[in-house]
UniProtKB/Swiss-Prot annotation:
Superkingdom per UniProt: Bacteria
Protein source organism: Acholeplasma laidlawii (strain PG-8A)
Entry annotated with the keyword Cytoplasm: yes
Residues annotated as catalytic: 170
Record-given protein name: Thymidylate synthase
Lineage: Bacteria, Bacillati, Mycoplasmatota, Mollicutes, Acholeplasmatales
Amino acid sequence: MKQYLDLARHIMENGTLKSDRTGTGTKSIFGYQMFFDLKDGFPLLTTKKTFLKGIIHELLWFIKGDTNIKYLVDNNVGIWTDWPYKNYMNSSEYQGESIKEFSDKIRQSDEFAKKWGDLGPVYGSQWRNFNGVDQIEYIINTLKTNPDSRRMVLSAWNPAEIGQMMLPPCHTLIQFYVVDNKLSLQLYQRSGDVFLGIPFNIASYAVFLMMVAQVTGFELGSFVHTIGDAHIYTNHFDQINLQLTRTPRRLPILKINKSITRLEDFKYEDFELVGYDPYPPIKGVVAV
């Protein structure tokens, strides 16, 4: 997608080198916005193959209100495993297990998963129980009864519980907007890992917009992506430069099961990606 490559190029050309929490180092800018009209296709990156299975399972996990990686691990999605594994490695119970062996223990033992697989009150907890408020339910009800409301805001940032989370929310605030019977969504993301995270976030919130539009009866509008600290880790420079040599291809189409009328009823099998023709994947190490 041109919007994504423009962001990456802008950071590489104009970003500032900064230190960061992980000790890796980044090139960073502050304040950037991208627009995606969903009538142009599903915004899944074509300049490298992107893990849609992980994106959809993670979103379903959020909607369930789940905060334990067991659901993800059971579905062979390891995008959140690094953080609890690091926590386990620092414990007295660690006996040299690899991350694969740790994942196997999560998969095989409910007791082990309960003790070591929970991330604290991260996204799913805040979406479904922010100090007792089910924000998803509120937004769905408001879209159905008062779609011109300016209060259709979903927040994952709960200052009182940040210290209990293994990783504080990066994509923090969502707002819905309706005009001409079209539903749009804007995301504010406080921190964006441009190589590994941002492609996931674009696709994830596009899927979320499609799901919410379907269950509330609206047509699709636009996804607006606003990023605070947009950064490229120094150990991803080569991967980003490779992507910048690739010409974006036609966007795919994401089909979803039209019979679903409740967000909670969606399953992975209800999504079908059509016409996806990406370049080969590009690997990169996540900064934990």
